[in-house]
A protein has these predicted regions:
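Catalytic-core regions of core metabolic enzymes
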Residues: 1-294
Length: 294
């Protein structure tokens, strides 16, 4: 079984009747994702792309079993939606929503931890197991099945880099966005711990960006635990000026912390091959894996 989701994963879409929810429900279904129900309060009894809609997660689960949730609920109501998913035992809960207040995010993460629930995001493009299932907004055609895991703070860079790996004949085991907000569920270290034991993954690509300390923490983990699989990385935002937010709420340099230079240095010290430009990653990945060198 892949690390988070696989072809057997049964999914509920929270916020299925909204523009994004309904659009991406159709694309996820077309990719092969097993969406068993949608939830939008007040819209119970309707259907979206043939999928039954319920007023609550609890009523959706009374009608049939589900494993995981993907959340397209607007930021103001996302906390409530996440709590409902956690209460119902859905795991993982993949939160696509951007702009969730930090205080709400802290409450969600604390509650998830108490309940042993894995949260992906918020402000994530989601998670995909290529050729099997995708939960989120990733364009399926960028990905192909294989043995390289891609873990990213950026959505669009995930697609670009995965597409370049695919183009070079290097498939992926799992690709996921940890989310661009300052407070997220899974971080790089959590995912590396999963990938360490994952028989489907031979090597890892980390896509980081300025701000915060997620990449430095990953570098420390890789170094101190002698992470057994090769890791390549790219850090976005080398040219970013201090104090300016670059796209994501979490992508901001404060003082000397969180600069691209620091992150690149820490990763390099940990034995990670850091790409100068995203298009270098297929080559670096190929050089690290004997089976790909032919």
């Amino acid at each position: 079984v892949p690390i988070l989701v696989g072809r057997q994963t049964r999914v509920i879409v929270q916020g299925i009747t909204g523009n994004q929810g309904s659009f991406h429900t159709r694309l996820m279904s077309e990719y092969g994702t097993r969406i068993v129900a949608g939830v939008t309060p007040g819209k119970g009894g309707t259907r979206v792309s043939g999928i039954p809609v319920f007023d609550t997660v609890a009523s959706a689960l009374e009608a049939g079993d589900a494993d995981a949730s993907v959340v397209f609920v607007p930021a103001a109501f996302a906390k409530e939606a996440a709590m409902e998913a956690i209460d119902s035992g859905l795991n993982p809960v993949v939160m696509i929503t951007e702009g969730i207040p930090s205080r709400d995010a802290m409450v969600i993460m604390a509650y998830a931890k108490e309940n042993d629930t894995t949260i992906v995001g918020p402000n994530t493009p989601g998670v995909i197991t290529p050729g099997e299932t995708k939960l989120g907004i990733m364009p399926g055609n960028a990905f192909s099945p294989g043995k390289v895991a891609v873990v990213s703070r950026s959505g669009t860079l995930t697609y670009e880099i995965s597409a370049s790996l695919t183009h070079e004949g290097i498939g992926q085991s799992t690709c996921l966005g940890i989310g661009g907000d300052p407070i997220t569920g899974l971080d790089f270290v959590d995912v590396l711990k999963m990938l360490r034991e994952d028989p489907h993954t031979d090597s890892v690509v980390l896509i980081g960006e300025i701000g915060g300390s997620a990449e430095e923490d990953a570098a420390r983990y890789i170094r101190e635990t002698r992470f057994p699989k090769p890791v390549a990385a790219y850090i976005a935002g080398r040219a970013a000026p201090p104090g300016k937010r670059m796209g994501h709420a979490g992508a901001i340099i404060t003082g000397s912390e969180g600069t691209a230079a620091t992150k690149i240095e820490r990763l390099t010290e940990a034995g990670v091959r850091v790409a100068e430009v995203p298009s270098d990653l297929p080559r670096l990945t190929r050089e690290q894996i004997p089976q790909l060198r032919q």
